[in-house]
């Protein structure tokens, strides 16, 4: 009895064990049922030794496995993986022409000081109100930027010129950027504002001049090309109409350059008959268009081309350029003077044509 008690005490010294572990190892189960008030339990030493683990760590593992197996509980395994916390961008975005952008704007130190000084002067409590005020005051400049952008898209040549002007404007702004001032704190605020306005006015004037020059040049080129195309189409489709236009272009300067020695008004009689003869007589056109068939009517020394018509009753002497042609592009009477002199000493029915160049 004493030995069992000592063994029990030795077991208590090793640790406190639950009662269910000893019930299975006891030899006298019936004694416990018949004598419930007998607290001194008898257990076989062999079973006790086999039931008690050797160390506390082994006992803990043994206890946990037995309890789970006996009661049927399953504890979920705790995962050692730590989920990464994703930061949410709570700032609202807006849709622009260049895509989605944040509503927040980061300002440099100098611009921020000027901005808040202006906001304090205006008495606004929100930055959006200050920006709204600035946009309203700069509507004219914004319209100029929009117009310049449209012109750049329409005309590439003007776009290059406008780009140079804008670069010069940016350089001037950068040069003035070092001399920037805080609104309300600079003593020369009014003077600097006047200088900036004068510079902007000069730049606007320069832009308008370049715009006018480019538009005029393009218009002149377009008109010239249209005239050339019209003449080519008329010459190809209706050769007779083109020859009539050429003759009218040649004879009009001839009419305007008549000089009379007499005071009488003989304009109608003076050029009417030569024009009719010029249109009707094939010999005159042959001599004028084919210099190789002129024969005796051409004088190489004096550059005289003589056209003879015995049926003509007019008495006059006519001098025309030698290189008379039917070119559309060149004016045969350019830098040349035409003279028509009436002289009764010349025989009737003779027309004298001579070159006369003015140096």
UniProtKB/Swiss-Prot annotation:
Axillary shoot and floral meristems. Residues 165-176 have a biased composition (Acidic residues). GO terms for cellular component: nucleus. Residues 157-179 are annotated as: Disordered. It is found in: Nucleus. Keywords: Developmental protein, DNA-binding, Nucleus, Transcription, Transcription regulation. Residues 216-233 form the R domain. Residues 87-145 form the TCP domain. It holds the Pfam family TCP. GO terms for molecular function: DNA binding; DNA-binding transcription factor activity. InterPro entries: CYC/TB1_R_domain, TF_TCP_subgr, Transcription_factor_TCP. One of its GO terms (biological process) is flower development. Interacts with SPL. Involved in petal morphogenesis. This is Transcription factor TCP1. The lineage of its organism: Eukaryota, Viridiplantae, Streptophyta, Embryophyta, Tracheophyta.
